[in-house]
């Protein structure tokens, strides 16, 4: 199993939308590195759900329930989606500032490549963030 972080603008697609809609496709990714990360995802991989822009916090966990397929919103046929399902809301959101303050997380893509919307995490990084949320 691999671990990931997915970023979404809460005014476009929020944690509450994800919970309400149930399993749904993660669409609209238009960056090649993010697309390649989507292609690496496997069924049952876990992803943090990150609210970008105003909140800038990890708020929940989703699970990949369907591996990549063509993004139906992409007219160029270059981009893909995966389907994800909400698993758990974090007890306490973990903010970008908290992540930046943790020396063990200084090299994660959320800090180093802040514009990337789909990024891998190491198991150790995942575990640290889970502890921070409790």
Segments from the language model and where they lie:
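Compositionally biased, charged N-terminal/linker segments
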Residues: 1-42, 133-134
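Short glycine/proline-enriched turns and hinge-like loops at secondary-structure junctions
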Residues: 17, 42, 57, 75-77
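Short, charged, solvent-exposed linker or helix-capping segments at domain edges/interfaces
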Residues: 17, 93-99, 130-132
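Hydrophobic beta-strand signal
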Residues: 48-49, 63
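Short, charged beta-turn/beta-strand-edge "cap" motif at the junction between a beta-strand
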Residues: 50-56
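Aromatic- and Lys/Arg-enriched surface recognition patch
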Residues: 60-119
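Charged phosphate-binding loop/patch that engages nucleotide di/tri-phosphates or the phosphate backbone
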Residues: 118-134
């Amino acid at each position: 199993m691999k671990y990931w972080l997915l970023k979404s603008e809460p005014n476009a697609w929020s944690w509450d939308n994800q919970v309400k809609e149930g399993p749904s496709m993660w669409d609209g990714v238009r960056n090649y590195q993010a697309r390649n990360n989507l292609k690496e995802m496997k069924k049952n991989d876990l992803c943090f759900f990150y609210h970008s822009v105003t909140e800038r916090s990890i708020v929940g966990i989703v699970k990949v329930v369907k591996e990549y397929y063509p993004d139906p919103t992409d007219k160029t046929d270059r981009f893909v989606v995966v389907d994800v399902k909400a698993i758990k809301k974090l007890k306490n959101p973990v903010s970008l500032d908290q992540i930046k303050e943790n020396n063990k997380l200084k090299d994660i893509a959320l800090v180093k490549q802040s514009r990337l919307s789909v990024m891998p995490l190491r198991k150790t990084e995942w575990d640290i963030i889970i502890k921070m949320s409790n």
